């Protein structure tokens, strides 16, 4: 049904200038959730963005605005009056307003802040003081706070009076007179409480999982995965409650981190823009530097081949198997690296696990290498008709290459973590470049020994 509504909306927009059926357009928009409406906005020309946005129901407009990409948000802001912009800013959650300010150019930021009310402006400025990738940078200050001496009835009344403007009321956070976090109580517990005169201190859970304002956002997202929370409280150095991180922010963090890791693992500069929103120049800048670096790194393989030209000249058939060996080594190393990076990303693997990693990877590598070597040996003798010594050289190299590649693939991400470098950088392209050179060294030295070159 949603797809039908979207298509109907797009058809009406195409003929809007002629039809002027604004009420019909509004009726269709009211049937669509904010993410679907935002997808329609992304495809509109800049001059139609304000027209459609003004038709959004008031309670939906802020949600649609939040779902838009920064580029589309800026185009829309440029088409809104100051009064309309103020209405949008007033409806945004503080963390979303802070994200907006961080993404916009200075002239747009100045206009946004000038339209925000003093309280919102103060909270935005407070959040901007925290590092962007920290819990403080992604938290919201709009939370439901209770006191331990409140009764259930008083707490429910406080939620009814103040809960409308909060990010979430599923969990209410209990603080003492100094705003120090002492417990958490769920709305579920309050609703089901049999005695409305019971104090909150008797219902609250005092074993609260919290993070500090400086906790890395990726670590925060892992807590959501581990405990299944909908929100996590954020405290300062003195355990005073300053905000919460909600599940929607955690999902955004995981998506951003995954996108960044995938880009780095494929030697592409990360970008927060959708593919079709990136210009040719953006794509060029994200790829060319890495390609240049990898091309220069690959010259080591050329130097190795040049150093063993005599061996290749003596047994030219060896040249035919270089691509197979380097590809096998690169693939094995990439498999190992991807597995280790994934384990580190979800907290399963720590740097001190390196000895266990090497032990496991070496055994797996020997099994994989032996399997490939046996199959390859038969293929070389039966189909390629090479001599047994040449087949032995290729297969011994294959086993050694698989072993070395998987060990390198296991070591580099852990080393990167110890050096405080993103492990994703030590991924497929870089591993392949390193393994190519080492594979050739192994190949030619095995050939010299076995073939007496």
List the model feature ranges, each with a label.
Residues 304, 317-336:
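Hydrophobic, small-residue-rich transmembrane alpha-helices and their short perimembrane loops
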Residues 122, 249-283, 334-357, 414-420:
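Non-transmembrane, extramembrane segments of multi-pass ion/lipid transporters
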Residues 34, 290-298, 321, 325, ...:
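Alpha-helical transmembrane segments in multi-pass membrane proteins
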Residues 415-435:
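Interfacial loop-to-transmembrane junctions
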Residues 274-293, 351-370, 391-394:
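Soluble-to-membrane junctions at the N-terminal ends of transmembrane alpha-helices
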Residues 295-312, 375-386:
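Juxtamembrane "helix exit" motif at the C-terminal ends of alpha-helical transmembrane segments
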Residues 1-269:
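Hydrophobic packing positions in regular secondary-structure scaffolds
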Residues 307-321, 384-396:
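Membrane-water interface of transmembrane alpha-helices in multipass transporters/channels
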């Amino acid at each position: 049904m949603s797809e039908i509504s979207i298509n109907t909306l797009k058809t009406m927009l195409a003929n809007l200038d002629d039809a002027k059926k604004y009420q019909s357009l509004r009726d269709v928009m009211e049937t669509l959730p904010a993410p679907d409406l935002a997808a329609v906005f992304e495809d509109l020309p800049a001059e139609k963005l304000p027209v459609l946005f003004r038709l959004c129901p008031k309670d939906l407009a802020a949600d649609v605005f939040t779902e838009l990409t920064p580029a589309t948000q800026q185009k829309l802001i440029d088409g809104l009056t100051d009064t309309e912009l103020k209405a949008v800013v007033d409806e945004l959650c503080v963390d979303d307003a802070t994200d907006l300010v961080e993404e916009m150019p200075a002239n747009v930021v100045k206009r946004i802040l000038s339209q925000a009310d003093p309280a919102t402006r103060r909270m935005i400025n407070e959040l901007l003081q925290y590092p962007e990738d920290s819990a403080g940078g992604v938290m919201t200050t709009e939370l439901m706070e209770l006191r331990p001496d409140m009764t259930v009835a008083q707490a429910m009344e406080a939620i009814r009076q103040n809960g409308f403007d909060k990010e979430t009321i599923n969990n209410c956070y209990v603080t003492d007179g100094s705003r120090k976090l002492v417990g958490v109580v769920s709305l579920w517990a309050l609703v089901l409480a049999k005695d409305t005169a019971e104090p909150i201190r008797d219902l609250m859970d005092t074993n609260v999982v919290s993070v500090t304002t400086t906790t890395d956002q990726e670590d925060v997202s892992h807590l959501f995965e581990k405990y299944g929370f909908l929100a996590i409280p954020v405290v300062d150095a003195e355990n005073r409650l300053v905000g919460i991180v909600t599940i929607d922010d955690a999902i955004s963090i995981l998506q951003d981190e995954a996108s960044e890791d995938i880009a780095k693992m494929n030697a592409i500069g990360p970008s927060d823009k959708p593919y079709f929103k990136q210009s040719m120049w953006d794509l060029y800048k994200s790829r060319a530097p890495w390609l240049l670096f990898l091309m220069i790194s690959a010259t080591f393989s050329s130097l190795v081949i040049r150093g063993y030209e005599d061996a290749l000249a003596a047994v030219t058939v060896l040249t035919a198997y270089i691509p197979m060996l380097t590809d096998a080594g690169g693939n094995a190393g990439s498999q190992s690296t991807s597995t280790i990076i994934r384990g580190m990303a979800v907290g399963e693997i720590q740097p001190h696990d390196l000895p266990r990693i090497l032990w496991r990877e070496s055994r797996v590598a020997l099994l994989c290498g032996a399997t490939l070597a046996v199959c390859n040996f038969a293929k070389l003798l039966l189909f390629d008709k090479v001599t047994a010594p040449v087949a032995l050289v290729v297969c011994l190299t294959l086993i050694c290459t698989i072993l070395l590649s998987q060990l390198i693939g296991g070591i580099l991400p852990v080393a990167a973590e110890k050096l405080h470098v993103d492990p994703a950088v030590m991924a497929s392209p870089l591993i392949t470049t390193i393994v190519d050179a080492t594979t050739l060294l192994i190949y030619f030295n095995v050939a010299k020994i076995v073939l007496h070159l």
